Structures are given as C-alpha cells and as structure tokens.
Design a protein with these regions (language model features):
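A glycine/threonine-rich phosphate-anchoring loop and its flanking beta-alpha core
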Residues: 101-197
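Short, glycine/charged-enriched secondary-structure capping and boundary segments
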Residues: 44-47, 96-99, 134-138
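Short hydrophobic segments within beta-strands
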Residues: 32-33, 84, 123
Length: 199
C-alpha cells in the first residue's frame, strides 16, 4: 500500500478576524486574491501588506501570460505568499512562492527544477479545488497552445487555512459547481487503481 499523507499543516478558524490575528500579517507578506473576496472580508482590517487582485491580470484559467503580468507587480522578495481564492489563485501563488518563478517556460518544460523561496499559505474559498493540499500547478501555456501541470514538492503549500466565512458568501452557482468538483474528487479517489481503504 502506498503512503497516504497530506503535507501542508491544516488549521481551521472561526472567522477572518481570527485568521488574520493568528497569522500576524506584516508588510513583508503578499496577498493574492480576488477583489470580490478581499473587499467584504478583509478591507476594513487595513492589512499592512500589498494585495494583488488576480482579475486585474486576466480572467479564466491561469495562463503563462497572466502569470507574467502578475509577476511584474510581485517582483520584490516577500516573507510569505498568502493565497485566498479558488484554483486559479492557488495555482498562481504556488509559482509566486518559487525562487525561479521568472523561468515559467523552463519549469513547465522540465528544464528547470522548482525551488521554494518563501512559505505559502493557501486559503481556499470554494468547496472543491483540492489545489490547497497538492504539489501541482496547472497553467495554460498560451504560446504553445496547450495546458500543462507542474508537479514538484516545492509547490506544496506550507499551511492551509480553512475559514468558513469565505465559503458562506459564495454565490449559489459557484457553490453548486465547486461542490460537484469536490464530489468528483471523492469518486476519483475511490475508483483510482491506487485506491486504499483510507482514500
């Protein structure tokens, strides 16, 4: 039987205020999120760190073009990357936390090895992404007309924060589709040739 493990530490918080207080956010941190998530839940807290809104760099699935645009505004070294959002946010943040994040094409071509630069804290805001506990980042490589996944232990988040407040306000359409996504992940685990009694 193969080992079943979850790498990131998982913590649950009652609300966003408790999460922020426990994390001790400083000016060295960088938050990557969506404006529609940040404004109602965090804006009034006047956090001391820079905040980048993913939708300002492109829409839809994460792409190499979106990441390059994002990288231009996230160039300085950061103490921690805090990713608050769905799969797109989490996949982009995994790359932002790398030392060699400016080598996206080489990383996805297998010509460069990912190296972690700083801790990554993943805060999922949908029910089914699963990306918060994996070592995979998927990007659409626009120049090559393909979509690829990069899997390496350097991409594991260091901590996952579960904050129910962030899922409560999810529009019904997103709640329904992300719940189906979670159900599909469960079925995949059960039907996998590598399934175990635990999975």
């Amino acid at each position: 039987m193969q080992e079943f493990r979850i790498r990131p530490a998982i913590r649950q918080y009652d609300d966003c205020a408790q999460f922020v207080s426990d994390l001790g956010i400083t000016g060295d941190d960088l938050i990557l999120t969506n404006e529609y998530i940040f404004r109602p839940h965090f804006e009034s807290m006047r956090l001391p760190c820079p905040v980048l809104y993913q939708e300002r760099y492109g829409s839809g699935e994460p792409s190499d073009d979106m990441f390059r645009a994002l990288l231009a505004d996230a160039a300085c070294p950061h103490g921690r990357i805090i990713a608050i959002g769905g799969g797109t946010i989490l996949d982009l943040a995994k790359l932002l936390a790398l030392k060699n994040r400016d080598q996206v094409a080489a990383l996805y071509a297998g010509e460069a090895v990912p190296e972690k630069a700083c801790p990554l804290i993943a805060v999922p805001t949908t029910c089914g992404t699963g990306s918060e506990v994996t070592n995979v980042s998927v990007l659409s490589l626009v120049s090559l007309g393909t979509k690829k996944g990069l899997a390496h232990d350097a991409l594991y988040p260091d901590m996952v924060a579960l904050v129910p407040d962030l899922v409560k306000g999810l529009p019904y359409r997103f709640f329904a589709t992300s719940s189906l996504d979670a159900l599909i992940h469960v079925v995949e685990s059960a039907l996998s040739p590598k399934a175990t009694p635990f999975s």
